[in-house]
């Protein structure tokens, strides 16, 4: 069986996540590189257009240059699969699992891959006493790193040096 040649490429970039600027920059770099190699390239920004409009375009493959929420968490990938168009990136489940820090940690632990100690906080049960108990039970010492469970890159990452700063920064994360 002959391999299909992907000549018409759609670069999906931008989006509405907190990483929009990074996605636009990397997406534009991909467009330049692909055009330089002789590919026909179109761009698509889902912040301004519905994914279903992709079906109207004459493309062979989607180059996913989205970052963060909806771009790396399985959402865009599920749209691409529903449109039955090949795309770059991991599949829906792999993307979802990799983007979610808690699921990733569980997979790493199950496979005996060492990672730092951690605990997760949910908005519904957040309170200073719960945080103190978790820190004591998990034997976690300061400083600690906090990060939203579903953000990419360094968005929301804070290094906190004491309980007061942990409470303050966690409240900010939950807003």
For each feature predicted by the language model, list its residue ranges.
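Conserved S-adenosyl-L-methionine
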Residues: 118-120
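Acidic/histidine-enriched active-site and ligand-binding environments that engage anionic O-linkages
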Residues: 132-146
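Conserved ATP-binding module of the ATP-grasp superfamily
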Residues: 115, 139, 143, 158-175
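Short Gly/Pro-enriched turn/cap motifs at secondary-structure boundaries
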Residues: 69, 148-149
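Short, basic/glycine-rich phosphate-binding loops at helix/coil junctions
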Residues: 112-115, 149
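ATP-binding N-terminal substructure of ATP-dependent carboxylate-amine bond-forming enzymes
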Residues: 1-93, 97-99, 103, 110, ...
């Amino acid at each position: 069986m002959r391999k299909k040649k992907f000549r018409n490429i759609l670069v999906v970039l931008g989006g509405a996540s907190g990483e929009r600027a990074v996605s636009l920059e990397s997406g534009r770099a991909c467009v330049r590189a692909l055009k330089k190699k002789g590919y026909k390239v179109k761009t698509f920004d889902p912040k301004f257009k519905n994914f279903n409009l992709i079906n109207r375009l004459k493309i062979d493959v989607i180059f996913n240059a989205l970052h963060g929420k909806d771009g790396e968490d399985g959402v865009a990938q599920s749209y691409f699969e529903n449109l039955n168009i090949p795309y770059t990136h991991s599949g829906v489940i792999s993307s979802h699992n990799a983007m979610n820090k808690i699921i990733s940690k569980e997979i790493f632990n199950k496979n005996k891959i060492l990672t730092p100690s951690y605990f997760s906080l949910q908005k519904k049960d957040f309170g200073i006493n719960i945080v103190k108990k978790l820190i004591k039970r998990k034997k976690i010492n300061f400083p600690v790193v906090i990060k939203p469970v579903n953000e990419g890159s360094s968005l929301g990452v804070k290094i906190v040096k004491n309980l007061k700063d942990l409470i303050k920064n966690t409240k900010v994360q939950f807003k």
